[in-house]
């Protein structure tokens, strides 16, 4: 059996096997029931992009990849293979309905956009974190995909969403407004509150 080796294109990027091809068709995710995944074709068979990444990566020589190679290939896989129909969000704009789901860092009702990242952890796992425009459910979600040391995907997790950010921000605003209202109430009624506190304090002393 031949040992897999890294094959590179003329521009220096790592080449996928010649018989590998992303299939732009969504199926139900098996790792997370709230998500979908696309397929890919390899050696005349179709596979789930989230369950069988390892068979392609190992063919490409995954264990010999350096850190940058693993980060680039993992991010490409998430963007072009798992989300092969629409891809991940590389910028906060460009929606069909012209609605901007993202706000500034001071906007508690909308999430702050962050570009996709891929980082190799100390244990060798690769963590890809990114935002995705979920057209099916009409919301943006922040996801994390973790590849293990064999190139297989071990988890797909929803970290946040536009909806969860809205309710979190709303609770922060309501909580802040309540605290402010109570503060103003006590300041305005200081003459009443102070004698009451003194009476209560004297009772405890007695």
UniProtKB/Swiss-Prot annotation:
Subcellular location, record wording: Membrane
Listed GO CC annotations: membrane
Main localization, broad class: membrane
Keywords, ordered alphabetically: Membrane, Transmembrane, Transmembrane helix
Residues passing through the membrane, by range: 166-186
UniProt membrane topology term: Single-pass membrane protein
Protein name as catalogued: Uncharacterized protein DDB_G0281707
Organism of provenance: Dictyostelium discoideum
């Amino acid at each position: 059996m031949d040992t897999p080796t890294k094959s590179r294109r003329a521009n220096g990027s790592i080449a996928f096997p010649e018989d590998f091809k992303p299939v732009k068709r969504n199926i139900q995710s098996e790792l997370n029931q709230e998500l979908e995944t696309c397929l890919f074709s390899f050696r005349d068979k179709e596979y789930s992009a989230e369950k069988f990444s390892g068979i392609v990566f190992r063919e490409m020589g995954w264990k010999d990849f350096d850190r940058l190679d693993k980060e680039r290939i993992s991010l490409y896989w998430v963007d072009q293979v798992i989300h092969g129909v629409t891809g991940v969000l590389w910028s906060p704009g460009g929606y069909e309905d012209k609605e901007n789901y993202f706000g500034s860092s001071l906007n508690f009702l909308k999430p702050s956009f962050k570009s996709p990242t891929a980082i190799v952890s100390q244990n060798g796992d690769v963590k890809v974190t990114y935002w995705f425009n979920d057209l099916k459910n009409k919301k943006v979600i922040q996801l994390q995909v973790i590849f293990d040391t064999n190139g297989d995907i071990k988890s797909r997790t929803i970290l946040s969403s536009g909806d969860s950010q809205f309710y979190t921000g709303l609770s922060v605003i309501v909580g802040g407004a309540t605290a402010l209202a109570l503060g103003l109430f006590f300041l305005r009624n200081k003459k009443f509150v102070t004698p009451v506190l003194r009476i209560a304090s004297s009772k405890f002393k007695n």
